[in-house]
Amino acid sequence: MYSSYSPLQRRQLREQTYTDTQSTYLLVYAPGRRNALTLSLAEQLHRKFRLVDRLEGELTPSVNGVLLVSEDVECTSTALTYFAAALQQGADLVVCDAVFGYDGGSALYQTDQHLPGQRCALLSRALLDRCRATARGKDDVLELLRLANQLAQNCRCVPQALLHFRRELCAEDVFSAKGRRALILSHELTMTGAPIVLVSAVPVLRSLGFEVVVLGPADEGPLQLFLDAGAAVVTRPDCVTSSALWGLATSADLVLANTVVEAPVVNTLNGSFVPVLWWLHDAFAGYPFITHKIPRELGKNVHICAVGSHATAAMHSVRPDFEIEQLIYGLPDYAAEQFPRYDISFAGGRTLFVTVGSLEPRKGPDIFCNAIRLLPSAVREKAAFLFVGKAADKGMYNAVDSLVRDYPQTVFYRKRLERPEVKSLMEQCNCVVCASRDDPMPTFVTEGLIFGKPSIVSEHTGTAGLVTEGVDGFLYKDDDPQQLADKLAWAIEHPEMLAAMHDDCRRLYEQQFSNESYVATLTRLVKELTDGE
């Protein structure tokens, strides 16, 4: 059986631990086709179960729970163990993640807050009895699953892909029959700006009555953030280019397409009956590679919004007639949260400058490196500089690595930090630096503002249009390292004045990036699209 597991299932299986659940007696109720199910049940580590095709006469007093199976499915050898363990811990409805497709290339990650469309779930004996008493049909699996979703008092979603459906995933697997459906499309699920700020859309859509599903490629960090926000997540490596899962979009009441990379999907839905909100975060650099996929005209069902004037100008450079509204993302007030303190002892009490972003030409790490080198030695030694981001370009990484080796007591590099670490870093640093050559609205600069930290930004960033020079930040022009060095030198020599900018930085966050203004704007846009308001 192991050879038939998907890559995700194999990866998870290596980390699973065995739990003794043999005291829990289960029924597996599968009245339909069950060839694959029967074979996989033979490999179960949990052995105290019976496979039945009817419930009448099988529900003896010793049965603790019943796994309802509406269609043929393969289970991992640990499936019943996980289901039984959740039952022992007090759950009355237990579901799990699953993979779909012949090779298991599509994965469905579920959350306790989003449990419609179940095809397989474990019910406690008490919950099953209540569902059977309410059901109209005679032990119809889908009806029992629907009622269980309504009547359950303690749902539990096992975060393991225990099931493998050989067919492709469809809308009925992730949405309920009658709920309002919102599908969010993201070309990447990484700990970068666009996916991170996209998380904030989930609670807004849920507050408007939508069931929310996120579609993206393999998880590289923020998947759990979406789950915590109450969305289900579907991953597939080729989700942007493959039409296999676009059926989810045609069955939705709203599609939120994130970034210009989703142009192929927008093009497909353009002029259709599906309302599409296209949220642009993109810099100029990406447009030459995708312009040919952007519609030349937009149907009434497609509305475009952007995170500021820079992202707007980027789209207008190729489609000048498009109407684009402003939707500047909102970030929660992280300053009010509790998180572990990140160790910045390497700074030695000196003024700490931080930049966060992948090491690639567009992000300008070489400009920042050159500016640090241009500082007088006596000034440079009074500060510490931290680069955070993956090495996306060899030349840019070499520039940072060379600087670290030349000034090991002053310059530091971290490939990646977890979200709590980034928050703590922003709380403790003195200033953030964004040297990007092309950056619509850098998220880490906004995160700095939350903690009252001023920024030094390039004129080629969306933030540059919001910063007031010397009040809540600083601006330099022409990608000039010397200008940046001059701003750094002033900040290093005037730490008290830098710290005194705290209140103005907080004010800029509250005026431009607070969750309240973002929620109000997004709510209005969604209602205009879906309700005609």
In which residue ranges do the predicted regions lie?
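A short, well-ordered alpha-helix in the C-terminal region of glycosyltransferases
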Residues: Q483, W490, M497-Q512, Y518-R524
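Short hydrophobic beta-strand element within catalytic cores of glycosyltransferases
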Residues: P454-V457
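Nucleotide-activated donor-binding/catalytic signature segment of Leloir-type glycosyltransferases, i.e.
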Residues: A232, N398-L417
